[in-house]
């Protein structure tokens, strides 16, 4: 058992179901396109349970844990698989082709019976899924929003609030948008736009690379990076989505002076894991929104990350699959302040002892 392994191809996406890890990898001449299933253990990448060689490069994975079904997007279609009860095989159960044929898909999300799909051109589509017994019976398009963004849709999240259903999208155009999809018989309705430009006036082209939404709290976190190579910066922002008509930025911090590519939330919603393009991981404490630890674990871009309990699993374009323990530590300033407080208390206690003749030092 190891905490880092080389799987021989660039890692594009990760998906965790129960204590298993699915890895989508491939791309590049002479490199194999693969779907691999691993057993996860605390601190280690365990046994390889399944390895499928694919004809096309799997770019992104999303799944439905309760049904042991997941999908991968490959250019203009999504291929759905079911996982056998003994975790020993994948079975292809449905292929959804997206028109037009030159469409390049980069994101999708499944919530209950609804599938939302985003492509490289900023188009947004909505589908209804009919499930059978660990299978998909049919998928039908129920909505479409032309030019939802003017660049690719990197991430999609669902939000339910007061019996209403919304989509949140994050795009390479630097914007996040909210759409009302409550009534599937009516067109998708644009509600509002929120952007890092509300907070930061530096003339730079910022891209919304990733988005995490916390249901119940109606809080979202976005990671946005500058595309200006000379002034490359990445920021993490916390947003209040309780009023979908007027999204409010709550906090923002500078994470890195390099572009950051992905983020994920740990299971108790207390920490974020963030990866950058030069092999570094950041752990962010959401209580106060501060980086509590950062660690250089490689030299290549860490393209994706997923939390498994209090461990962060990362995949790099340099073929490395790795698992690292969440490390939180006191900020140095806090330690200094604590030292000063203890020193003052010690002096006060010494004065008290001297004043009451409880101590007698002779030199």
Describe each model-derived feature in a short phrase.
Residues 25-31, 73-75, 118-121, 170-173, ...:
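Conserved strand-to-loop turn within each blade of WD40 beta-propeller repeats
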Residues 8-16, 55-63, 100-110, 148-159, ...:
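Canonical WD40 repeat/beta-propeller blade segments in eukaryotic WD-repeat proteins
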Residues 33-40, 78-82, 124-128, 176-181, ...:
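WD40-repeat beta-propellers
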Residues 1-6, 44-53, 87-104, 134-152, ...:
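Inter-blade linker and blade-boundary elements of WD-repeat/beta-propeller domains
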Residues 328-363:
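C-terminal single-pass membrane-anchor helix
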Residues 303-333, 358:
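Blade-level signature of beta-propeller repeat domains, shared across WD40, Kelch, NHL, RCC1
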Residues 1-4, 20-51, 75-87:
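Beta-propeller domains
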Residues 21-23, 70, 115, 167, ...:
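Hydrophobic beta-strand positions that form the internal "hydrophobic ladder"
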